[in-house]
């Protein structure tokens, strides 16, 4: 399993490309032939960038293009005069029907609900944890008077201030606010919003850098300096990092939107 942060490649092209490469490399160690079924994102510059990155990273000996009316030709053009990879064009079977947006959403909800059906809420202490996708927890927590000073500068309630390699990071309460963001930029602060973590879908990364499982953040507990995370994993003892996603979801699979 590889967690890239969301169910759509849009906004996560680098993560999707690297994760695909990692999974294919592992599969190659145990199989004579590996077939990579890529996503349906094929249109526009984003689709071309993602597919080109996967081809360059995977270096396949053959690319099989399933298309209806030549919609993949723009993706295939760079390989027209190259000796590798070979390109085989196939027509999509007439019986194949594209799923609607609602059908895709309903399927995701069922899959999430099934995955988290037996989830328990486990504790992840901040002292032994890092975050991927945020500067929070990367620095040194500053004394309380730094919070009061930051509140005066930013105009919001600040729960924690850290000194990171890039300056000061303020953990703010409430919802994201553009006025606060502008003030932070002017005053040299980086702002992370505590509300970001509510129901956030995360990847639980073990000490070897592998995705051990998924979780949903139930609470960022400032008093006890810990995250409470719903996950089907038996234990979080080997978890070293939370890879923060960009979507929020409930245990029953209901998607709450982007973080």
Task: Annotate each predicted stretch with a short phrase.
Residues 1-34, 42:
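Nucleotide-state-sensitive switch-loop elements of NTP-binding domains
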Residues 23-88:
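Phosphate/Mg2+-binding loops and adjacent switch elements
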Residues 61-259:
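Preference for solvent-exposed, low-hydrophobicity sequence contexts
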């Amino acid at each position: 399993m590889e967690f890239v942060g969301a169910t759509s490649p849009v906004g996560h092209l680098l993560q999707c490309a690297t994760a695909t490469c990692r999974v294919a490399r592992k599969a190659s160690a145990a199989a004579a032939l590996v077939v990579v079924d890529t996503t349906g994102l094929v249109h526009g510059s984003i689709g071309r960038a993602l597919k080109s990155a996967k081809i360059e990273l995977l270096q396949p000996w053959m690319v099989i293009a399933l298309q209806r009316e030549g919609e993949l030709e723009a993706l295939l053009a760079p390989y027209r005069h190259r000796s590798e990879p070979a390109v085989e064009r196939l027509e999509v079977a007439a019986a194949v029907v594209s799923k609607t947006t609602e059908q895709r959403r309903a399927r995701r909800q069922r899959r999430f609900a099934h995955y988290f059906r037996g989830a328990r809420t486990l504790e992840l202490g901040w002292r032994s944890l890092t975050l991927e996708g945020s500067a929070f927890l990367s620095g040194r927590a500053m004394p309380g008077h730094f919070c009061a000073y930051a509140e005066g500068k930013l105009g919001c309630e600040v729960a924690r201030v850290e000194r990171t390699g890039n300056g000061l990071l303020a953990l703010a309460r409430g919802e994201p606010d553009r006025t606060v963001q502008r003030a932070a930029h002017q005053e040299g602060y980086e702002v992370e919003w505590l509300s970001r973590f509510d129901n956030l879908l995360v990847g639980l990364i073990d000490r070897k850098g592998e995705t051990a499982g998924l979780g949903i953040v139930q609470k960022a507990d400032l008093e006890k300096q810990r995250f409470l995370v719903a996950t089907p994993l038996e234990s979080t003892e080997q978890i070293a990092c939370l890879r923060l996603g960009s979507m929020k979801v409930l245990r029953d699979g209901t998607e709450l939107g982007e973080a």
